[in-house]
Amino acid sequence: MVSERIRAMGSRHWLLLFGVIGTAWGLLYAMALPSDLRAAGQVYGLDFLTQLCVVTPDAAGLFRVTLMWCLMSAAMMAPTVLPALATYDDLAQTVPDTNFAHLVAGYLMVWLGFSILAALLQMGLFYADLVSLFGDSRSATLSSMLLILAGLYQFSPVKEACLSKCRQPMMFFLQYWTDGPWRNGIRLGLVCLGCCWALMLLAFVGGVMNLVFMGIATVIMMIEKLPQIGQYLTKPLGIFLVASSVWVLLSGW
């Protein structure tokens, strides 16, 4: 069974998806490089990456911040939905009216909407002098509020309901199959958003362009959606985040 799944993931649509994920991480890595190394990239025709990192408090800056969040969402959220996509791919072998690309496009469309809202929030926080232009929190109060929000959300019924669907992708697709791949992709994206939006906003605490934070957060969200072990992570993570919020507020970090 495992060998069959590995072979199936060698097909074109899977390779394209892995290419999107890899490209997103590669661009984020390039954007996170120190400015002198990014400038050196101009010699190799990579000056466009330098321009992407020039974030300014105007419309062009908002576009760049939105692009940054889009890359983050693709890099971090696409890996967390791989088990659900594998389930869909298995069903597609026996059920008609399937389209893997439409499903993924619908899913990513939801995260595009989130990225736009997150970029607007980042610019608003910047104008309030609560974060830097690159989204790093300048306020212990803001960091503490985001941590306690994410921590308490771990215990919410909404989070639990969304996680239950993420952990049972077979039941999810069978329930909504007749809606078609595009609408199912959007619905899957909304369910994922319901699971992860609060954790994603912790980028303002960990650093929007902090690759270590992104990597850790991605692994946590992937594990949390696994049916066998995810349930053992959700509430302890919530306790840890609430405790961290208290520590940040008291320490003024």
Locate each region found by the language model:
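Alpha-helical transmembrane segments and their membrane-interface junctions
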Residues: 118-126, 193-212
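Juxtamembrane transmembrane-helix termini in multi-pass membrane transport proteins
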Residues: 6, 65-108, 112
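Histidine-/acidic- and/or cysteine-rich, low-complexity loops and terminal segments associated
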Residues: 1-70, 126-135, 157-175, 242, ...
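Small-residue-enriched transmembrane helix starts and helix-helix packing motifs
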Residues: 53-74, 143-150, 176-188
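Hydrophobic alpha-helical transmembrane segments in multi-pass integral membrane proteins
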Residues: 115-122, 191, 195, 244-253
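Interfacial loop-to-transmembrane junctions
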Residues: 7, 219-243
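Transmembrane alpha-helix/helix-exit interface in multi-pass inner-membrane proteins
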Residues: 112-127, 140-167
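A mid-sequence, solvent-exposed acidic-amphipathic segment
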Residues: 152, 157-198
